[in-house]
């Protein structure tokens, strides 16, 4: 079950407590949750509308302050709390902040009921990239501070983060025009994800084994497609040898 606890592209928000309780208590399926607190985001938008009163849009550089660290943490903390109470299997999508990492465990993947992923964008970019790339790196959750990026990289290596994902969401360049409110959120990532991670391997950020584990083996285990994934890998290795 993919659960949008924060609004993103499309109208799929589920943030009413009764609905959330029904989902967490009513399924033994994996719940994959996009976590951003809608009330916090709404209040931040109003604050920036007042700051830029009369402007056609809010600068895209304000996007990480609108979809802020508190917005991400509040929603992720709620999801983890509900999962623990219900005994549900939970996978937090697109973790983008250092603060959220305290919600997760670095124990072996096989022992976890609650897992987490980081996206390629949050492992590559920081606030400073808005100056050169603008809305092209606008995504939900937002790309945030360098300290968040470095914490996420460390968490991938330590086991707090179990998966590296793409959150592939391509748009026309014309749809990426505008600022924090008008430009569409999302980036094309499938075609760049492996190349980008291999560049980080070359830089010494990750080992090749870690990239394979986080982009292939762990997702296969978490989503229950392990037999197919490993069969294909073994077949490829046999042919290569």
Regions found by a protein language model. Name each.
Residues 66-70, 181-186:
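A short glycine-threonine-serine/GTX helix/turn-capping micro-motif
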Residues 182-196:
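Gly/Ser/Thr-rich active-site loops/lids in small-molecule metabolic enzymes
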Residues 199, 206-228:
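Mid-to-C-terminal alpha-helical segments outside catalytic/metal-binding sites
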């Amino acid at each position: 079950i993919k659960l949008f606890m924060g609004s993103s592209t499309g109208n799929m928000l589920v943030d009413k407590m009764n609905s959330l309780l029904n989902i967490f208590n009513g399924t033994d399926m994996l719940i994959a949750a996009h976590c951003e607190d809608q009330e916090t985001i709404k209040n931040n938008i109003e604050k920036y509308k007042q700051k830029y009163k009369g402007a056609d849009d809010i600068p895209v550089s304000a996007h990480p302050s609108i979809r802020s660290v508190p917005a991400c943490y509040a929603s992720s903390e709620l999801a983890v709390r509900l999962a623990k109470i219900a005994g549900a299997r939970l996978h937090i999508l697109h973790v983008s902040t250092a603060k959220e990492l305290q919600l997760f465990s670095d124990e072996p993947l096989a022992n976890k009921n609650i897992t987490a992923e980081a996206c390629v964008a949050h492992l590559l970019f920081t606030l400073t990239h808005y100056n050169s790339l603008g809305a092209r790196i606008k995504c939900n959750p937002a790309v945030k501070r360098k300290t968040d990026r470095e914490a996420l990289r460390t968490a991938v290596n330590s086991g707090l983060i179990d998966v590296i994902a793409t959150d592939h969401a391509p748009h026309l360049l014309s749809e990426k025009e505008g600022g924090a409110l008008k430009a569409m959120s999302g980036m094309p990532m499938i075609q760049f994800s492996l190349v980008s991670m291999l560049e980080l391997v070359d830089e010494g950020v990750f080992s090749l084994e870690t990239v394979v584990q986080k982009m292939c083996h762990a997702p296969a285990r978490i989503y229950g497609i392990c037999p197919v994934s490993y069969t294909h890998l073994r077949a490829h290795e046999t042919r290569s040898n």
